[in-house]
Amino acid sequence: TGRVYAGDVLIDDTTAPGQPAAKIKTHTSYGFATQVVILDEEGRVERVLAAHDVGRAVNPALCEGQIEGSVHMGLGYALTEELPCPDGMPATFKLREIGVLRSRDMPEVEVTLVEDPEPEGPFGAKGVGEIGLVPTAAAVAGALYAFDGVRRFVLPMKDSPAAKAMSVGRIRGLKPREPVRS
């Protein structure tokens, strides 16, 4: 037996096929998400600053947690995660071997919630799911370029000092790819 919380806003973004619609709204767009990655003197990821437009933060702690999780995914995508599929089949079925960041490898994440309410969104909120993942790889690449002058164009950036500092698993027998550099 749950509780029912009635809202004072009704969102109806659908129109039946063949019915005229005075105002068509295809989607609610996000505002922005930006991140800055700070490396230590050895090139390891020390801290990530993440500022995200969430509309109205109905649950600020949940919003921050969602963004921290997105940063975790983004760092793995940028630095260590890889799942090659030769002939359409995964090279491994072991999660520990695909380079997922472990909690001990997570840097400090400082989240700034920017609240610019969406007038047509539920209670002024916007989405904070996938958008948090978008800027991470570029922020890591920019920080690494500032650190060592190497532009990296292939993900994951396993040749970087940041990736080498991570204690992640590797797929046995997989030869590392050569990085593409300018």
Regions found by a protein language model. Name each.
Residues T1-S182:
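C-terminal catalytic domains of large/alpha subunits in multi-subunit enzymes
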